[in-house]
């Protein structure tokens, strides 16, 4: 049974989160959690929370056994960017894009 968990509008760029997502794709859930725990990146904490949510969803909603679960799919899409302005010299201004991402984790017992 496939179970999904999503985190929308995560305050990190999709490019940075994808680096972490690639580490756990296809792994068993226990191994993936261990990998994320010792990965020294902000995105690792975001992905770990979504993975824990997917595990809880599988256990509570589908009655799945945690030991059998694998990360079958994980993907990161770009979310909306917040536009901000950075004042510069001589009355000019630069645009700053504060990027967000949508993190989706799918776990399955197959």
From Swiss-Prot:
Q: What is the lineage of its organism?
A: Bacteria, Pseudomonadati, Pseudomonadota, Gammaproteobacteria, Enterobacterales
Q: Which family does it belong to?
A: Belongs to the universal ribosomal protein uL22 family.
Give a GO molecular function annotation for the protein. Answer: rRNA binding
Q: Name one GO cellular component term.
A: cytosolic large ribosomal subunit
Q: Which organism is it from?
A: Yersinia pestis
Quaternary state and interactors: Part of the 50S ribosomal subunit.
Please name the GO terms of the biological process aspect recorded for this protein, alphabetically.
Answer: translation
Which residues are in coiled coils? none
CDD domains per UniProt? Ribosomal_L22 (cd00336)
> What gene, per UniProt, encodes this protein?
rplV
Briefly state the protein's biological role. This protein binds specifically to 23S rRNA; its binding is stimulated by other ribosomal proteins, e.g. L4, L17, and L20. It is important during the early stages of 50S assembly. It makes multiple contacts with different domains of the 23S rRNA in the assembled 50S subunit and ribosome. The globular domain of the protein is located near the polypeptide exit tunnel on the outside of the subunit, while an extended beta-hairpin is found that lines the wall of the exit tunnel in the center of the 70S ribosome.
What Gene3D superfamilies does UniProt report for this protein, alphabetically? Answer: Ribosomal protein L22/L17
Question: How is this protein named in the record?
Answer: Large ribosomal subunit protein uL22
Keyword list, A-Z: Ribonucleoprotein, Ribosomal protein, RNA-binding, rRNA-binding
> NCBIfam families per the record?
rplV_bact (TIGR01044)
């Amino acid at each position: 049974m496939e179970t999904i968990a999503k985190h929308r509008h995560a305050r990190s760029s999709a490019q940075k989160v994808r680096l972490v997502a690639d580490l756990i794709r296809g792994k068993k859930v226990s191994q993936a959690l261990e990998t994320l725990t010792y990965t020294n990146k902000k995105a690792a904490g975001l992905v770990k929370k979504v993975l824990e949510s997917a595990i809880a969803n599988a256990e509570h909603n589908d009655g799945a056994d945690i030991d059998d679960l694998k990360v079958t799919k994980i993907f990161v899409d770009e979310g909306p960017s917040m536009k901000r302005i950075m004042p510069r010299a001589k009355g000019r201004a630069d645009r700053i894009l504060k990027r967000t991402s949508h993190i989706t984790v799918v776990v399955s017992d197959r």
